[in-house]
Amino acid sequence: IGKELAGYQFRIQVSPLDCTGCGNCADVCPAKTKALVLKPLESQEVEMPRWEYMDKKVGYKQVVEPNNVKNSQFVQPLFEFSGACAGCGETPYIKLITQLFGERMMVANATGCSSIYGASAPSTPYCTNYKTGRGPAWANSLFEDNAEFGFGMAEGANRLRERVKRLLEENMSAFSAAVQAAATAWIAGFDDKDQTLALSDALLAALEKETAPVA
């Protein structure tokens, strides 16, 4: 699977109880000997404990950056087990987008199929990263104003971030050296999409230990 992944093995572990039987995976498999073959559910019950083991004990190992198609598929999808129709052509794209951007992703969902399987209360196919707890923020407006709705979500998030930045700058002198260093780094990387999550984690960790009342 590549030099950068030496020491690892890659496995597609199917959840038999969640497979919709559309056959797409078997159809598109390029191998001469198919890696995935559709079989009756009764014969695949042995895969259920294997799925549980892979989910709870193995999980995803994100040791490479998702900067190409292959590497993106080693990242945990933050969209899984939707109630979309079997073989739906939309869901693979949503899965891929969450693998690339899911931890900092906001979805303003126009009304349609994706708004139905995206929020079939009380369940949702969107989930969080198993390590960080971050995942897509999702909402839908019924009023055919999706562009304005999404713009409002983005503007709201921007205003909150700008407020945090302003409060840090105004109170910088009251913080300990550790918080000052973390806050300065966060402000410097304010618009750096590749660094902001790590900088945010460092700032939060420093603030949790801060004793200054302003914190």
What are these regions (language model features)?
Residues 142-211:
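N-terminal leader/propeptide and maturation segments of large enzyme subunits in energy/redox metabolism
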Residues 1, 15, 24-43, 68, ...:
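Iron-sulfur cluster-binding cysteine motifs and their immediate structural context
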Residues 1-21, 38-45, 72-82, 213-215:
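Ferredoxin-like iron-sulfur electron-transfer modules
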Residues 38, 107-110:
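General beta-strand structural signal in soluble alpha/beta enzymes
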